[in-house]
Amino acid sequence: MSDILSQDWRDRRTFAIISHPDAGKTTLTEKLLLFGGAIALAGAVKGRKAAHHATSDWMKMEQERGISVTSSVMQFPYHGKVINLLDTPGHEDFSEDTYRTLTAVDSALMVIDCAKGVEERTIKLMEVCRLRTTPIFTFVNKLDRDGREPMEILDEIERVLHIQCAPVTWPIGMGRSLKGIYHLARDTVYFYTTGKGGASINHGETVVGLDNPRLDTLLPDIIDDFREEIHFLREVGNPFDHEAYLRGELTPVYFGSAISNFGVEEMLTDFAQLAPPPRPHRTTEREVAPQEEKLTGFVFKIQANMDLKHRDRIAFMRVNSGTFRAGMKLWQVRLGREVKIPDALTFLAAEREHAQEAFAGDIIGIHNHGTIRIGDTFTEGESLQFTGIPDFAPELFRRVQLKDPLKMKALLKGLAQLCEEGATQFFKPLIGSDLILGAIGVLQFEVVQQRLETEYNVKCQFESVAVATARWIEAPNDKALKQFIDKNQANLAHDHYEQLVYIAPSRVNLQLTQERFPDIVFSQTRDHLAQ
């Protein structure tokens, strides 16, 4: 791919799309690929019998339900830049996967439903972005439907998300009366049109200059009021400030309709120019700059069985510095060993190509035979660890019941591989033979159950179990750890990394145990460092 893609790390634009479920994120992802030339025809995400399934929703359950369950990675060239788009789960049960994905991007695109405004999941994701001072573009979607007043939406974004809004495009009408959008910086009106059901690109008329007499002909009943509205907007609205955007303090706001392909191209063109190139990343030892010659990278996601024909596991690695070349040897810091990477991959969702080269900001896929974990750092020899890639204590627990006892080996293999992806965890109590699965949301159990059956030919069911919460255990010394284990064996388990975990039957039990053992650290999250 290197013959059509820029080889300069400064041309990389690596970002994630964040939104509440049903705000149109997966549809927008499709349309970005359409405008980027990565796909020729956009498939409707839900429903229509003749429509293709959305390119980024390749897992069977995602195709059936029309929700994004795992993060896909897609790369395409656009206006001289290389766009690396990480599609995150839209369903709240998969917030862990989304959180980790946000550690691998340099900016984010927030999608808001023009009728619903700022919703709960958007608020949570913005909190994560704020912690990392991630620059945010905003796309207010579904302009082809009746929604709230644009100014009201801007006010809500500023009030609820604590970020200034700088309108860049502004709608002329909405719903059935939608006529177009006006780009304030380009002083250009783009008239509303749609491709065939939104499946292909179809440009409407463009008029340069808000004072152009052509607008009086095309919009005789509303153009005077609209000119006044824009005059008012320029006076009271925030002008776009690039530095404030890069600091995560201000978001440029675009309006459009992803399903109609409208307003998307204007936003994507600006994004390619304004979004930041790869940024420095912190490690336990020092900060790594993208322009450094030697390659460094970290694994933020593992996906099992992306292709049932291959029965594979792919580790997704973000390149933070240097250049990856096919066949090069890398140092896997956690294991202290050198590994050869002969056949790394790049992605167009489930489509894969062998990567000959990759640069800072790019995401590559490495075949994983059980030795790579989320959070692993790869270098050309230097011992350092990238930080900030989290695991979360599960909120929900189920006991795994196997329907065919002869399938136990396949069950353990399947659970181990699916847990490697980080979306679910399983625990083996020190006493007894139970297998306990932990997750953030109920949907994760359904996904694991379906994937065990589809990918590993293992049928099982999940039963409720008397576990309220879990905490990773650390002790100041071996003596304190042994005392703790001796007195709490009934509530202790090992996770799939053989880390010791306290599984509490109730919140009260956890609190009392913490009070009885003040020297023991009970961690609700853990970093993937050197485990």
UniProtKB/Swiss-Prot annotation:
Pfam families: EF-G_D2 (PF22042), GTP_EFTU (PF00009), RF3_C (PF16658). Keywords: Cytoplasm, GTP-binding, Nucleotide-binding, Protein biosynthesis. The keyword tRNA-binding does not apply. Residues 10-279 form the tr-type G domain. Gene3D superfamilies: P-loop containing nucleotide triphosphate hydrolases, Peptide chain release factor 3, domain III, Translation factors. Belongs to the TRAFAC class translation factor GTPase superfamily. Classic translation factor GTPase family. PrfC subfamily. The gene is prfC. It comes from the Bacteria. One of its GO terms (biological process) is regulation of translational termination. It comes from Dichelobacter nodosus (strain VCS1703A). One of its GO terms (cellular component) is cytosol. GO terms for molecular function: GTP binding; GTPase activity; guanosine tetraphosphate binding; translation release factor activity, codon nonspecific; translation release factor activity, codon specific. Its main location: cytoplasm. Increases the formation of ribosomal termination complexes and stimulates activities of RF-1 and RF-2. It binds guanine nucleotides and has strong preference for UGA stop codons. It may interact directly with the ribosome. The stimulation of RF-1 and RF-2 is significantly reduced by GTP and GDP, but not by GMP. It is found in: Cytoplasm. GTP binds at residues 19-26, 87-91, 141-144. Transmembrane segments: none annotated. This is Peptide chain release factor 3.
